[in-house]
């Protein structure tokens, strides 16, 4: 089983642009169940059930998608929004570029970790560990540029990745680093 098969993607945040300008009041009427309260938040919030995602739509035409577990769900979500807006006679781009901003994933090293020893071994320039403030160790990986949160249970949360393969690279790197110093 490859490392990628043991990694669970929990959330993908992606952005796109659907137009130069959008009338959010008109969109609020077109998207049943949407939330638009401009005095509280400048964007419109719309939640989908399938795939289970949410989008934030802004007057500038920018759209953020969150909650997707895979890239297909991001694409499906944007396609659904485009389709619904076009049906409501709202002009939007047909095939906008989608940019992944962040992928959050979890991984289990299947071994309890001594975070104090790890903090000493991995070098203070890349590590933050203050157990009084937060129970996890923050490990900033330079290549790929991601942040790993390591917990005593052996669970690892990876954030900051833009592509799925970056998560796998980071997991392989941290495993090698910990094996090299005999901590797993």
From Swiss-Prot:
Q: Which residues span the membrane? A: none
Q: Which UniProt keywords apply?
A: DNA-binding, Repeat, Transcription, Transcription regulation
Q: Does the keyword Transferase apply?
A: no
The residue intervals holding the sequence repeats read 9-85, 100-178
Q: What Gene Ontology terms for biological process does this UniProt record contain?
A: DNA-templated transcription initiation
GO MF annotation terms: DNA binding; DNA-binding transcription factor activity
Similarity comment: Belongs to the TBP family.
In terms of HAMAP family, this protein maps to: TATA_bind_prot_arch
Question: What is the annotated role of this protein in its UniProt record?
Answer: General factor that plays a role in the activation of archaeal genes transcribed by RNA polymerase. Binds specifically to the TATA box promoter element which lies close to the position of transcription initiation.
Q: What is this protein called?
A: TATA-box-binding protein
State the taxonomy lineage. Answer: Archaea, Methanobacteriati, Thermoplasmatota, Thermoplasmata, Thermoplasmatales
Gene name, please?
tbp
């Amino acid at each position: 089983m490859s490392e990628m098969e043991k990694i669970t993607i929990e959330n993908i945040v992606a952005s796109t642009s659907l137009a130069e300008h959008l009338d959010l009041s008109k969109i609020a009427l077109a998207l049943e169940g949407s939330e638009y309260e401009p005095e509280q938040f400048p964007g419109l919030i719309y939640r989908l059930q399938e795939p289970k995602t949410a989008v934030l739509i802004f007057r500038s035409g920018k759209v953020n998608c969150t909650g997707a577990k895979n890239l297909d769900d991001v694409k499906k979500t944007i396609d659904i929004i485009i389709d619904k807006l076009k049906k409501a006679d709202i002009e939007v781009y047909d095939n906008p570029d989608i940019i992944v901003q962040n992928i959050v994933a979890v991984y289990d090293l299947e071994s309890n970790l001594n975070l104090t020893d790890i903090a000493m071994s991995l070098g203070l320039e890349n590590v933050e560990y203050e157990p009084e403030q937060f129970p996890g160790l923050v490990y900033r990986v330079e290549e790929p540029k991601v942040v790993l949160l390591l917990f005593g249970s052996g669970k690892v949360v990876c954030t900051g990745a833009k592509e799925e393969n970056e998560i796998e690279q980071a997991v392989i790197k941290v495993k090698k680093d910990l094996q090299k110093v005999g901590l797993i």
